[in-house]
């Protein structure tokens, strides 16, 4: 998958120079590219309201981050559960109309979740960094900021709002960007969860130092098709290196039944990230119990 960071104009050659500048009317090739383009503009607006310097000053007074990886390794369930606080998605639209992030988060904790994931994207998932802050005030377990991270600014903002871990999506980041952002995350005492969708992306991530937690997304972000075989195939293909490096694997997307959970567990997943199948239930606590009945 190729992600262009900004919609380009056709290249223009002037003498021996070749110019290519952003085209505000360019069309994205797929939803992930559209999201990344939107993030470019969104972060620019955020910086206008609050500078990175001022944001970093706020971060210095934030409480220490909680041990996200430790919570997974000592999971209350097997595999460990990262339960997602999620109102909507591009593929499903609004998942829960009566969306109360704090109540949902508390129900997840009661059900035995080891960690929570909170969507902060507003345009495509109807989340917010304010929701992250509200959940942080209400629960004590570690929190993952589920965002499309392309700039350090977003990482500092997530830390200020209470995140203990940050999602990094390999598909939208160059290797050099991944390395740089991972270094920043570690420097703030947080855990990077690096998400992959293919064997090529997994190989890229395994070549980077500082990676201890890898998420395998079973959803094809171009077609939205879901296959749990993605988790099985990727773990099988690189199981020796994963074991040797002591890397924890999180299976993400498409887990709706005890049979699904059993499949990814037997494949070798240490944890699962589940949102839709829990958040749409009237009683998320009971939904967790039902799901882990395999």
UniProtKB/Swiss-Prot annotation:
Tell me which domain of life the UniProt entry assigns to the organism this sequence originates from: Bacteria
Q: Which InterPro entries match?
A: Aldolase_TIM (IPR013785), Indole-3-glycerol_P_synth (IPR045186), Indole-3-glycerol_P_synth_dom (IPR013798), Indole-3-GlycerolPSynthase_CS (IPR001468), RibuloseP-bd_barrel (IPR011060)
> What pathway or pathways are given for this protein in its record?
Amino-acid biosynthesis; L-tryptophan biosynthesis; L-tryptophan from chorismate: step 4/5
Arranged from A to Z, the UniProt key words for this protein are: Amino-acid biosynthesis, Aromatic amino acid biosynthesis, Decarboxylase, Lyase, Tryptophan biosynthesis
Q: List the disulfide bonds.
A: none
Enzyme Commission code: 4.1.1.48
GO molecular function annotation: indole-3-glycerol-phosphate synthase activity; phosphoribosylanthranilate isomerase activity
The identity of this protein, by name, is Indole-3-glycerol phosphate synthase
């Amino acid at each position: 998958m190729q992600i262009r960071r900004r919609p380009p104009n056709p290249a223009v050659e002037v003498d021996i120079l070749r110019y290519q500048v952003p085209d505000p009317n360019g069309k994205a090739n797929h939803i992930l590219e559209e999201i990344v383009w939107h993030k470019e503009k969104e972060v620019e607006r955020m910086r206008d309201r609050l500078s990175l310097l001022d944001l970093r000053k706020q971060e210095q007074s934030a409480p220490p981050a909680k041990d996200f990886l430790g919570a997974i390794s000592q999971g209350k369930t097997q595999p460990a559960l990262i339960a997602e606080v999620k109102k909507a998605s591009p593929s499903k639209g609004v998942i829960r109309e009566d969306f109360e992030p704090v109540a949902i988060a508390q129900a997840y904790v009661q059900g035995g979740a080891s960690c929570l994931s909170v969507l902060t994207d507003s345009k495509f998932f109807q989340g917010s960094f304010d929701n992250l802050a509200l959940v942080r005030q209400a629960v004590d377990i570690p929190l993952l900021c589920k965002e499309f991270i392309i700039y350090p600014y977003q990482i500092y903002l997530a830390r200020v709002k209470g995140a203990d871990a940050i999602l990094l999506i390999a598909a939208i980041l160059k290797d050099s960007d991944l390395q740089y952002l991972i270094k920043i995350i570690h420097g703030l005492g947080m855990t990077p969860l690096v998400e992959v969708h293919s064997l090529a992306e997994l190989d890229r991530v395994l070549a980077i130092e500082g990676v201890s937690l890898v998420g395998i997304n079973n959803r094809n972000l171009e077609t939205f098709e879901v296959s749990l075989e993605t988790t099985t195939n990727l773990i099988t293909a690189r199981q020796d290196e994963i074991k040797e490096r002591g890397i924890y694997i999180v299976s993400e997307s498409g887990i709706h039944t005890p049979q699904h959970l059993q499949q990814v567990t037997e494949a070798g997943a240490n944890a699962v990230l589940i949102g839709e199948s829990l958040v749409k239930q009237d009683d998320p606590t009971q939904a967790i119990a039902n799901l882990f009945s395999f």
